[in-house]
Amino acid sequence: MGPTEDPTADLILLTQQEALLRFDSFDPDTAWKLGNLLHAALLARNAGGTVEIECDGQLLFACTTPSAKPTQGDWIRRKRNTVRLLHRSSYAIGREIARDGATLESAHGLSEIDYAAHGGGFPLWLRTHSSALDATDVCVGSITLSGLPQRDDHNLVATAIADLLNIRIPHLSAAI
């Protein structure tokens, strides 16, 4: 099985990423730095994309690249909704339902009109203790990107967060 065919193997890596990619603090300056990393990464790929970062319901960063499509705003909204409700990356939710042969509707009672289980949405976690695996950490927002194939959307967000935090993370192999 190739990397995109094995949801269980992907979920192991995604769970590790989600445990590691947590902030000690997050403010508008942090959002600006992270958003600009994502914007620069899209431009380096000559990709049309949209980026949004929100915390506690407040929009802290939003941008598009020149060739972004108008529909990407709706993808951002749907991925953000998924992350904010389920506190997992939108790609992890997609891999879970692929593994289980389910849909958003059957697994979570969610309509695809308002939710998306596609890569690019990532939870914004704040640590409340020193351990990255501490169950009392709090999901306070989302970091969302749309414009690339979903696996690449996810990888770009996870890589940018890791770069900003200056940590190494396990990576999913690139989309095939």
What is the predicted function of each stretch?
Residues 43-110:
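Structured interaction and signal-relay segments at domain junctions
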Residues 1-72:
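Intrinsically disordered, low-complexity terminal regulatory regions
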Residues 19, 80-82, 148:
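Ordered alpha/beta subdomains of enzyme catalytic regions
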Residues 6-13, 17, 28, 99, ...:
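Amphipathic, alpha-helical segments enriched in basic
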Residues 84-85, 155-176:
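Short, solvent-exposed cationic patches
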Residues 105-165:
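Extended hydrophobic
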Residues 29-32, 97-107, 166-170, 174:
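Short, positively charged
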